[in-house]
């Protein structure tokens, strides 16, 4: 036993010497090493299974099953989504359809409609402007919904209906006062927000001032705008023309608020030259003008009295009551006034003998035509090419009329025709805006009475 220990010590000493000859650093390490012969026997422990490393999911794989609009991201090619087995689906959409979570239904495209929703598709890259515009115009966000509701409610206000005859015509056509959503969506302000009519209909359902039909194709006001309401509004609304250079809402409110409280202001711009909008949209003028609504008619009358700039008749501010200058009422009154003037001013003659018209014979007409008197003034190309006979001329009853440039008309009976004394067939002369006859003195020249001797 002692001999075996001695041999082991010798072997260790030999090994130590061999290591000392290898180098300084190795010798230092060998000097620090001590062999412990009394150490217990080493017994290896039982091997423990190391945890399996987590395998990251393959890029492009999603669970639950994600589908693009028009294709499946898994590329199963089932035909329902239209992926065609490409592995990435259709890349034409920037939104992903998220279906149900049943793994057995992934390749059958069976999804729960209640749990379906859309998320953004990062795999599809669009330009920033196109991506933002498409997402904003095809999705009904809260901001977009509020803008649509605010704009359409403004279009249905009393002042807008008064200034915009197009919407009023649509309201009058429908027995319930509905306006097509397609027309509302075609306006410039709404088209700038969205071109989707369905989104406009969905947004308007949240309005408390508007009612959308069940099919979502028509919209109307909750309270109808009657003719009585229109007349009352016109009575307390004034029209302002020749507006100042700064015709902003704040500046106009400051100007017209001097006489009383201003409820609403609408600035009406002139129509564009190539615009297809009806002329009824601009009631009063083809220039820029403003409609100012006051609380009552007293304040409106006061505004007309105080705010008119009569010193500058060309470019000064013009303020008028809307009720007094409605085009329809002016046209109606003018027609009635013209009828009264025709019946009162034009005399009727029962026989041709009492008529003061000039009677010229055929020979006199020939002589006058040769002398360039009446015929010369009348017959310079007038009536040529129309198949008219140069021998039949008359004014008043059953003939035709012509003037000689001095505001005087010659009455010549038609040859071979029966004379009739109906005043309705007389040609109307020019009229002034108030309905009175114009150019009664022949543009400032004294009237000349013609007789057969002068001819």
Curated annotation (Swiss-Prot):
Record-annotated RRM domain positions: 236-324
UniProt name for this protein: La-related protein 6C
Domain of life (superkingdom): Eukaryota
Composition bias type Basic and acidic residues, residue spans: 1-20
Keywords, alphabetical: Nucleus, RNA-binding, Transcription, Transcription regulation
GO biological process: RNA processing
Organism, as annotated: Arabidopsis thaliana (Mouse-ear cress)
Role, per record: Transcriptional regulator.
Keyword Hydrolase: no
Molecular-function annotations in GO: RNA binding
């Amino acid at each position: 036993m002692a001999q075996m220990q001695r041999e082991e010590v010798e072997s260790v000493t030999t090994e130590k010497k061999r290591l000392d000859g290898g180098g300084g650093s190795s010798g230092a390490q060998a000097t620090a090493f001590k062999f412990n012969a009394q150490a217990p026997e080493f017994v290896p422990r039982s091997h423990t299974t190391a945890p399996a490393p987590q395998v990251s999911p393959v890029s492009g794989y999603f669970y639950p099953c994600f589908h693009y609009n028009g294709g499946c991201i898994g590329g199963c090619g089932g035909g329902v989504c239209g992926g065609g087995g490409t592995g990435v689906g259709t890349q034409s959409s920037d939104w992903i359809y998220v279906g149900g979570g049943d793994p057995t239904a992934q390749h059958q495209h069976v999804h729960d409609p209640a749990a379906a929703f859309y998320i953004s598709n990062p795999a599809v890259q669009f330009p920033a402007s196109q991506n933002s515009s498409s997402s904003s115009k095809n999705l009904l966000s809260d901001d977009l919904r509020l803008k649509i509701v605010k704009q359409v409610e403004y279009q249905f206000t009393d002042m807008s209906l008064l200034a915009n005859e197009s919407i009023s015509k649509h309201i009058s056509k429908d027995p319930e006062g509905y306006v097509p959503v397609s027309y509302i969506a075609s306006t410039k302000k709404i088209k700038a927000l969205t071109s989707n009519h369905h989104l406009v209909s969905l947004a308007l359902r949240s309005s408390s001032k508007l009612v959308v039909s069940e099919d979502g194709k028509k919209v109307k006001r909750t309270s109808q705008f009657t003719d009585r309401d229109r007349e009352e509004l016109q009575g307390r609304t004034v029209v302002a023309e020749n507006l100042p250079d700064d015709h902003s809402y704040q500046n106009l409110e400051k100007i017209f608020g001097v006489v009383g409280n201003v409820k609403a202001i609408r600035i009406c711009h002139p129509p564009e030259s190539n615009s297809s909008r009806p002329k009824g949209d601009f009631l009063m003028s083809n220039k820029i003008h403003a409609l100012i609504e006051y609380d009552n008619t007293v304040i409106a009358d006061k505004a007309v009295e105080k705010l008119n700039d009569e010193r500058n008749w060309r470019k000064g501010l013009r303020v008028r009551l809307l009720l007094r200058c409605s085009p329809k009422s002016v046209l109606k009154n003018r027609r009635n006034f013209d009828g009264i003037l025709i019946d009162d001013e034009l005399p009727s003659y029962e026989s041709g003998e009492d008529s003061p018209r000039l009677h010229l014979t055929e020979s006199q007409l020939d002589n006058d035509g040769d002398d360039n008197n009446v015929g010369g003034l009348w017959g310079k190309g007038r009536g040529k090419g129309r198949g008219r006979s140069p021998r039949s001329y008359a004014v008043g009853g059953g003939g035709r009329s012509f003037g000689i440039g001095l505001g005087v008309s010659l009455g010549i009976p038609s040859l071979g025709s029966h004379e009739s004394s109906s005043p309705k067939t007389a040609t109307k002369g020019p009229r002034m805006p108030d309905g009175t006859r114009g150019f009664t003195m022949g543009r400032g020249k004294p009237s000349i009475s013609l007789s057969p001797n002068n001819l």
